[in-house]
Amino acid sequence: MLALCGILALAVLGGVYGIGRLRSNPAAAACEPAVATAGRVAPLAHGEVAALALAHTPFLVPVLAFKDAEGHARTLKDWRGHTVLLNLWATWCVPCRKEMPALDALQRELGGPKFEVVAINIDTRDPEKPLAFLKDIGVTHLTYYSDQSAKVFQELKLAGKAFGMPTTLIVDRSGCEIGEMAGPAEWASPDGVKLVSAAISSPDGASAITQ
């Protein structure tokens, strides 16, 4: 009887965990193409973008809520169908300030219907300060996005994708991570442009994700 109970218990546990496996995160499964893209662009992660950590496991980037320059609510989901270089920055972050011209230049060179640099400012106090800073350094190609609550950083931190500033993620057309960068980079350098161009042109990343 005890042996039979043990067998039944194992069967029940196996059934439960089997169901769990069958119901594994569909978003993660849909992000497999982004991992393939990461593998494809990995040989280009050198020189000025050598610190880019390419995705080895599927990860759907949180939707993230922020605002545009007019104060309209936006989420990262608005960019489904586009490859995105997502960057979190602040005026109090010296490396962020130094990186902004390169991000602006990358948007000038590659920005269009297939790609955008989405740089989100997370200053929590004076909302005019980052705008004045961007004007002072001559940034003209980046669209201004902000989150004065800094929740976008906290969400990425909880997901293990943000540890400091600046934080940058390359996100594919389905909202899945291709790679992440902790710290600044010369994104408009030949190394950066070549890598991002390869990510944009990748045939992967067309899986439909509804969440």
Question: Which residues are covered by each model-predicted region?
Answer:
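A short beta-strand-turn-helix
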Residues: 53-58, 63-84, 209
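N-terminal targeting signals for export/organelle localization
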Residues: 1-61, 208-211
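Structural microenvironment flanking redox-active thiols in thiol-disulfide oxidoreductases
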Residues: 98-138, 148-155, 211
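Short, low-complexity, Pro/Ser/Thr/Gly-rich segments in the mature regions of secreted, periplasmic
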Residues: 197-210
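Thiol/disulfide oxidoreductase modules built on the thioredoxin-like
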Residues: 132, 136-141, 147-199
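Alpha/beta-hydrolase fold active-site loops
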Residues: 83-84, 115, 166
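Conserved redox-active cysteine motifs that mediate thiol-disulfide chemistry
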Residues: 80, 88-105
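Extracytoplasmic
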Residues: 59-61, 79-81, 112, 128, ...
